């Protein structure tokens, strides 16, 4: 019998509202079966799959559904419980598992959930493999089922969080500590709520925690990397040295300096790239940024003598460009930072430790490290839309786009794109004059809102 589902995989795995397709228990069971069949086709013998999740209420039912699908096909599951996405990638490699699966909708609200699949090397699986899995799910064709003792079992990995904490700490220089540093930390009530405080406290920092009390329905709710205002205020209030905000699954980071100024992924990339080049630790003097990267940041990186490759937005695309061009450092404005010397996916805590190391070794405040980087005026507005109609098919939007580009001139740029994980149109305008950029971005966002919007924007 065919299972009728809409397209499963988006730009970052499967994602959607819990109990609505594609994020239903029924489809999740089929997804587990499809992953199992792909693994069984790859080689014979017993197979193991690591399963982690964030703190969403719906994580329990999807964890059980996924495990049921995998076990029914003879796969042994190693169950981690709540752990950051990069922790799943690490444990998959450490346990020599055949695959890793993270149940999370990343920065989305609690009502959403998702599934990210990692290969045995800890990389997100390819588009080709995703398509193969999707075809199996839609056709519900999984081949013969194992019988009797051949069905799979699940095993809870008791020390998974502790192992990941030790792995992350090992990316910080031996013999160094964070003693004397006061850090405001916001874990978005998400997967990092235990791991991140443990890492920084065990390295002897004074940690002031926000977003570390998950209820299942408060993940990302006015906190974390999407709401850095929380740590901006707290850093000033507590006279902290810096603030660190993670998203719901811990794979992205936004920082705040001691003055309360936001340090986004563009700035973190610049700081770390400059340090690595100075230490001759950046192969080929190359980095990967994205099409959203601020023009001023690109000029700064090129001024350091670095070759900058740009990819589409999304950590999958950043990683693909890194592997293609033999690059070990890449990142995007939203805070996904990939240090291939340490992990195979974005890792917010590892990224924070690299910046902290640079601060300590250079005896600098975070604001000192960002001072040489002059960003171009840039405005980003997120417009909630009813549906993702191709923008070029809407005449008024096309006319407004041309008018805005004419007003900006040849040195300005506009980027319009739909989010790959939410019904949002992102409007980015960049130029030389902040007031003009703000006004033009608002004008363009207003037209998109009038044509497609729900009346909500950020």
Curated annotation (Swiss-Prot):
GO terms (BP aspect): carbohydrate metabolic process; peptidoglycan biosynthetic process; UDP-N-acetylglucosamine biosynthetic process
The protein, known as: Phosphoglucosamine mutase
HAMAP family given in the database record: GlmM_B
GO molecular function, one term: phosphomannomutase activity
InterPro entries, sorted: A-D-PHexomutase_a/b/a-I, A-D-PHexomutase_a/b/a-I/II/III, A-D-PHexomutase_a/b/a-II, A-D-PHexomutase_a/b/a-III, A-D-PHexomutase_C, A-D-PHexomutase_C_sf, A-D-PHexomutase_CS, Alpha-D-phosphohexomutase_SF
SS bond list: none
Comment on bound cofactor: Binds 1 Mg(2+) ion per subunit.
UniProt superkingdom: Bacteria
Keywords for the protein's UniProt record, in alphabetical order: Isomerase, Magnesium, Metal-binding, Phosphoprotein
Alphabetized Pfam families for the sequence: PGM_PMM_I (PF02878), PGM_PMM_II (PF02879), PGM_PMM_III (PF02880), PGM_PMM_IV (PF00408)
One annotated Gene Ontology cellular component of this protein: cytosol
Family statement drawn from the similarity comment of this UniProt entry: Belongs to the phosphohexose mutase family.
Positions carrying Phosphoserine: 106
EC number: 5.4.2.10
Reaction(s) catalysed by this chain's protein: alpha-D-glucosamine 1-phosphate = D-glucosamine 6-phosphate
Swiss-Prot/TrEMBL cofactor(s): Mg(2+)
Changes after translation: Activated by phosphorylation.
Sites where the protein binds Mg(2+): 106, 247, 249, 251
Source species: Chlamydia pneumoniae
Active-site feature positions: 106
Protein task: Catalyzes the conversion of glucosamine-6-phosphate to glucosamine-1-phosphate.
């Amino acid at each position: 019998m065919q299972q009728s589902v809409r397209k499963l995989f988006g730009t970052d795995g499967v994602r959607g509202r819990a109990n609505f397709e594609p994020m239903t228990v029924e489809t999740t069971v089929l997804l587990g079966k499809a992953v199992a069949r792909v693994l069984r086709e790859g080689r014979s013998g017993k197979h193991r799959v690591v399963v982690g999740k964030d703190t969403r209420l719906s994580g329990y039912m999807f964890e059980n559904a996924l495990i049921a699908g995998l076990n029914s096909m003879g796969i042994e599951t190693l169950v981690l419980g709540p752990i950051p996405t990069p922790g799943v990638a690490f444990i998959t490699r450490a346990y020599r598992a055949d695959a890793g699966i993270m149940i999370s909708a990343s920065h989305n609200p609690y009502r959403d959930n998702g599934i990210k699949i990692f290969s045995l090397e800890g990389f997100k699986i390819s588009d080709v493999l995703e398509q193969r899995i999707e075809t199996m799910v839609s056709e519900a064709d999984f081949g013969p089922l194992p019988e009797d003792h051949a069905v799979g079992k699940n095993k809870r990995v008791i020390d998974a969080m502790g192992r990941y904490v030790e792995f992350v700490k090992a990316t910080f220089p031996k013999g160094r500590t964070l003693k004397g540093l006061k850090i405001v930390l916001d874990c978005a009530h998400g997967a990092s709520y235990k791991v991140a405080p443990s890492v920084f406290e065990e390295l002897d920092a004074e940690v002031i925690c926000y977003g570390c009390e998950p209820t299942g329905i408060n993940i990302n709710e006015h906190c974390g990397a999407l709401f850095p205002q929380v740590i901006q205020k707290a850093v000033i209030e507590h006279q902290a040295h810096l603030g660190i905000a993670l998203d719901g699954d811990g794979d992205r980071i936004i920082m705040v300096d001691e003055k309360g100024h936001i340090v986004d992924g563009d700035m973190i990339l610049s700081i770390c790239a400059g340090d690595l080049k100075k230490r001759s630790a950046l192969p080929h003097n190359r980095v990967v940024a994205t099409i959203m990267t601020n023009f001023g940041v690109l000029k700064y990186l090129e001024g350091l003598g670095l070759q900058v490759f740009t990819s589409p937005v999304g950590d999958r695309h950043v990683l693909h460009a890194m592997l293609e061009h033999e690059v070990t450092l890449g990142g995007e404005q939203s805070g996904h930072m990939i240090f291939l010397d340490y992990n195979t996916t974005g890792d917010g805590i590892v990224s924070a430790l690299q910046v902290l190391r640079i601060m300590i070794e250079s005896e600098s405040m975070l604001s000192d490290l960002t001072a040489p980087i002059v960003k171009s005026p840039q405005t980003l507005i997120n417009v909630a839309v009813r549906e993702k109609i191709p923008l070029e098919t809407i005449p008024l939007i096309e006319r407004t786009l041309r008018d805005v580009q004419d007003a900006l001139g040849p040195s300005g740029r506009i980027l319009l794109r739909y989010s790959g994980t939410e019904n949002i149109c992102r409007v980015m305008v960049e130029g030389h004059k902040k007031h003009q950029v703000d006004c033009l971005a608002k004008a363009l966002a207003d037209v998109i809102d009038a044509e497609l919007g729900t009346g909500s924007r950020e």
